[in-house]
Amino acid sequence: MSRYRGPRVKKIKRLGSLPGLTTKKPPIVVRDPRKLSRPKPKKKSQYRIRLEEKQKLRFHYGLTERQLLKYVRIAGKAKGPTGQVLLQLLEMRLDNTLFRLGMASTIPQARQLVNHRHILVNGRIVDIPSYRCKPRDLISGREKEKSKALIQNYLDSTAKRPIPLPKHLLLFHSDDPRDLLKGSVKKIIDRKEVGLKKIKELLVIEYYSRQISP
């Protein structure tokens, strides 16, 4: 299954807030109180509940089905709780790290920056959005004016809707426009700092349980 490129508001109406996918909000529908109330929604099956949690992860981080399954399998073989390791793997991706630093308004924007070779990691161009960031990695835009302008524009737009910087990241501010825009990774992210606040990662693991069992 390919990466989702359809209407983003449609997804957040069904799944709730997905800040990595879009900054938009679904329109508020004002209903006529004189009309009969709608019937109560049917109770969701356990399968659907797990499916929706999986879809939240997939759309928030902008992954294909195959990519997410691969991360679940890697997490299952790692030390520590599988769900927590899965979230750490997703959060430490380069595209998500740029998004959490405020260098992009959404993860798709961050992915474009990486794909178009605007981003340096430890002084070298990295054009792979799935690059796994590590503690002490230094992330910056290239010295090209186009790269600087793009990232500064994203930083300005994210400043209008301030989002707390997670504790595992550090953003260097400078008043000199000639300076490179830089951020660094201080440590592996803690579970409580994950960007998708209401995710129930254990349900995602349960959804994939048959596909990852030996």
Swiss-Prot record:
An example Gene Ontology biological process: ribosomal small subunit biogenesis
Family annotation (PROSITE patterns): RIBOSOMAL_S4 (PS00632), S4 (PS50889)
Keyword match Ribonucleoprotein: yes
CDD domains, A to Z: S4
Main localization category: plastid
Compositionally skewed regions (Basic residues) per UniProt: 1-14, 36-46
Entries under SMART domains matching the protein: Ribosomal_S4, S4
Keyword RNA-binding: yes
Pfam families named among the record's database cross-references: Ribosomal_S4, S4
Domain S4 RNA-binding span(s) in chain numbering: 92-153
Gene Ontology, cellular component aspect: chloroplast; small ribosomal subunit
Database matches in InterPro entries: Ribosomal_uS4, Ribosomal_uS4_bac-type, Ribosomal_uS4_CS, Ribosomal_uS4_N, S4_RNA-bd, S4_RNA-bd_sf
Region (Disordered): 1-46
Gene Ontology MF terms in the entry: rRNA binding; structural constituent of ribosome
Subcellular locations according to the entry: Plastid, Chloroplast
Family from the record: Belongs to the universal ribosomal protein uS4 family.
Annotated function: One of the primary rRNA binding proteins, it binds directly to 16S rRNA where it nucleates assembly of the body of the 30S subunit. With S5 and S12 plays an important role in translational accuracy.
Subunit and interaction comment: Part of the 30S ribosomal subunit. Contacts protein S5. The interaction surface between S4 and S5 is involved in control of translational fidelity.
Alphabetized NCBIfam families for the sequence: PRK05327.1, rpsD_bact
PANTHER family: 30S 40S RIBOSOMAL PROTEIN, SMALL RIBOSOMAL SUBUNIT PROTEIN US4M
Record's protein name: Small ribosomal subunit protein uS4c
Organism placement in taxonomy: Eukaryota, Viridiplantae, Streptophyta, Embryophyta, Tracheophyta
